[in-house]
């Protein structure tokens, strides 16, 4: 099977992948030759018959590890490094490369990269740059942690004495539950006298300023609303007497205009129809109904002189016709 990250590949499956037909065949040339030399089934190969008795089986390897390595071996890389170092030490002792002098008697000359950079003529000394690369200032435990070396000497467990309790220590046990304890503490905190904080006066003044700002905003909002209302409503809300006087003046102005429009042909029937129309159109209860005076347009004013001029021309034509008849 191909993994998700791998490319596709075709696989051919044989009828007998383990090759059991060959292993079970006793008439093989190699097996007959070994049996003549004294070998029999169940014995291993070799002079002392210490070889493998089973057939070699093919195993699929899908990782990049070495032969015989498993994933669990990766976790023990520090132990592998220790084993490798021990092997190198044994090889050195066998070949005589290790000196007999102990490390305690040796006086190792420490090489400080930081001091060398200070002494050098060139401008190389940068504090963080040199200090980070200088390992002479590091301790042995730090180096072991960096390079992954395990400590060979283990601290004896028996030497560690258990911590003895002090003689002056006192332990108190209470019968209260956790909820009762915290309720008691909260009651004690509430009963404590509250000390006035000097910053509280400042906070109160700030709150008062904010309240004053809110009031000013509300007042300005009301002024804007009253300004946006129509003028007739504003007058009527505050002064009802003045509104009534304005209605009377409007009625007086509309009366002569209605008489002019009626003319001499106005009958009682038209008055009755007007009264009927007035009866039909009644204001709803609880509301004032004011008749707005009708505004006359400029075109209507021009209509009257035109009609008068037409009447004059008709009279002139009639007079001329009468004169002609009389002359004849």
UniProtKB/Swiss-Prot annotation:
The record marks 50-51 as: (Microbial infection) Cleavage by enterovirus 71 protease 3C. Keywords: Centromere, Chromosome, Kinetochore, Nucleus, Phosphoprotein, Telomere, Tumor suppressor. Residues 26-72 form the G-patch domain. The modification Phosphoserine is found at residues 270, 273. GO terms for molecular function: protein-containing complex binding; telomerase inhibitor activity; telomerase RNA binding. Residues 254-328 are annotated as: Telomerase inhibitory domain (TID). Its main location: nucleus. Changing residue 291 to A: Abolishes interaction with TERF1. Residues 235-261 have a biased composition (Basic and acidic residues). Ubiquitous; expressed at low levels. Not detectable in a number of hepatocarcinoma cell lines. Residues 1-28, 147-177, 189-307 are annotated as: Disordered. It comes from the Eukaryota. A motif (TBM) lies at residues 287-297. Residues 161-174 have a biased composition (Low complexity). One of its GO terms (biological process) is positive regulation of protein localization to nucleolus. Pfam families: G-patch (PF01585). InterPro entries: G_patch_dom, PINX1. It is found in: Nucleus; Nucleus, Nucleolus; Chromosome, Telomere; Chromosome, Centromere, Kinetochore. One of its GO terms (cellular component) is kinetochore. The TID (telomerase inhibiting domain) domain is sufficient to bind TERT and inhibit its activity. The TBM domain mediates interaction with TERF1. Interacts with MCRS1, TERT, TERF1, NCL/nucleolin, and the telomerase RNA. Belongs to the PINX1 family. Microtubule-binding protein essential for faithful chromosome segregation. Mediates TRF1 and TERT accumulation in nucleolus and enhances TRF1 binding to telomeres. Inhibits telomerase activity. May inhibit cell proliferation and act as tumor suppressor. This is PIN2/TERF1-interacting telomerase inhibitor 1. The lineage of its organism: Eukaryota, Metazoa, Chordata, Craniata, Vertebrata.
């Amino acid at each position: 099977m191909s993994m998700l990250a791998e490319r596709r590949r075709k696989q051919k499956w044989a009828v007998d992948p383990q090759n059991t037909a060959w292993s079970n065949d006793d008439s093989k040339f190699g097996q007959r030759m070994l049996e003549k030399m004294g070998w029999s089934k169940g014995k291993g190969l070799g002079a002392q018959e210490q070889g493998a008795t089973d057939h070699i089986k093919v195993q699929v390897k899908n990782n990049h590890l070495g032969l015989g390595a498993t994933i669990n071996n990766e976790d023990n890389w520090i132990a592998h490094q220790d084993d490798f170092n021990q092997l190198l030490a044994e090889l050195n002792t066998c070949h005589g490369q290790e000196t007999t002098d102990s490390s305690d008697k040796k006086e190792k000359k420490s090489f400080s990269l930081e001091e060398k950079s200070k002494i050098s003529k060139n401008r190389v000394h940068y504090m963080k740059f040199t200090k980070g690369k200088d390992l002479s200032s590091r301790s042995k435990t730090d180096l072991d942690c960096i390079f992954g070396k395990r400590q060979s000497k283990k601290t004896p467990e028996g030497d560690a004495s258990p911590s003895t309790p002090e003689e002056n220590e006192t332990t108190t046990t209470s019968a209260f539950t956790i909820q009762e304890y915290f309720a008691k503490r909260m009651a004690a905190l509430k009963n404590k006298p509250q000390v006035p904080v000097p910053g509280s006066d400042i906070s109160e003044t700030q709150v008062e300023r904010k309240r004053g700002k809110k009031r000013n905003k509300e007042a300005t909002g009301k002024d804007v609303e009253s300004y946006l209302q129509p003028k007739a409503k504003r007058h009527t809300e505050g002064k009802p007497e003045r509104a009534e006087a304005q209605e009377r003046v409007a009625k007086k102005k509309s009366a002569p205009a209605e008489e002019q429009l009626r003319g001499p042909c106005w009958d009682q029937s038209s008055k009755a129809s007007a009264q009927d129309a007035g009866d039909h159109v009644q204001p709803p209860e609880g509301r004032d109904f004011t008749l707005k005076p009708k505004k006359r347009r400029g075109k209507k004013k021009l209509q009257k002189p035109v009609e008068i001029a037409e009447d004059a021309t008709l009279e002139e034509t009639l007079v001329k016709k009468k004169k002609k008849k009389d002359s004849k």
